[in-house]
């Protein structure tokens, strides 16, 4: 959206929009270490949990927001596991078929004494089924909770970038667009149900464009 807005405003005609996430290397921190400790023990804080997965205002974990969404909309454990298994299986099939090979830039990674070419997403768990997911225990800490290590989002590292340019510049350079940006929107919801944020933004996009949800062939959720 920011790239498109820069182009629409005339501030740019080509923008590389990118982002990255490195959860596995998030450090542990001693929050008072900069100014020194007097006496007693110090506690190491997991910055991945504290800075990324915990609401800054209400201090609850992201897993609790997922539990809240389940409570609010009556989502069952069976529905969670079925959706998760289906998602894993689709991803596994897409990787096996090489659907994203042309979009992936292999990265050389040193593993022990060997250089390994990293080019496959490690996130999907091969052979995941509803049956295997149903055996996992809740990990959110909520009594009677539904969120498990199998139906929750994983701990991942990754990066992506896309080149966005004006139609005029694309024609000038002879570039064939892969897609056209039509509209974007931001939507805000209560932090305790943050998982439904895309619903609010999608409704705004539909209102701006006059489209309906049936006009979309693919929705990334």
PLM feature segments, named:
Residues 1-11, 166-167, 208-209:
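Alpha-helix C-terminal capping segments
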């Amino acid at each position: 959206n920011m790239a498109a807005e820069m182009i629409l405003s005339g501030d740019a005609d080509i923008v590389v929009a990118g982002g990255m996430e490195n959860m596995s290397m998030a450090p542990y921190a001693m929050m008072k270490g900069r100014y020194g400790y007097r006496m007693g023990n110090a506690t190491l804080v997991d910055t991945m949990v504290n800075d990324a997965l915990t609401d800054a205002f209400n201090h609850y974990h992201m897993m609790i927001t997922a539990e809240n969404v389940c409570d609010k909309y009556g989502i069952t454990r069976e529905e969670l596991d079925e959706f998760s298994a289906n998602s894993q299986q689709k991803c596994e099939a897409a990787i096996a078929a090489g659907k994203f090979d042309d979009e992936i830039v292999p990265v050389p990674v040193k593993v022990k004494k060997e250089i390994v070419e990293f080019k496959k997403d490690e996130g999907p768990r091969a052979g995941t089924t509803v049956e295997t997911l149903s055996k996992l225990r809740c990990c959110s800490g909520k009594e009677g909770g539904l969120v498990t290590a199998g139906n929750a989002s994983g701990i991942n590292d990754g990066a992506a970038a896309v080149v966005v340019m004006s139609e005029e510049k694309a024609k000038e350079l002879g570039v064939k667009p892969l897609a056209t940006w039509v509209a974007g929107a931001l939507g805000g919801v209560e932090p305790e149900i943050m998982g439904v944020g895309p619903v609010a933004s999608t409704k705004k996009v539909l209102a701006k464009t006059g489209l309906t949800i049936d006009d979309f062939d693919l929705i990334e959720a």
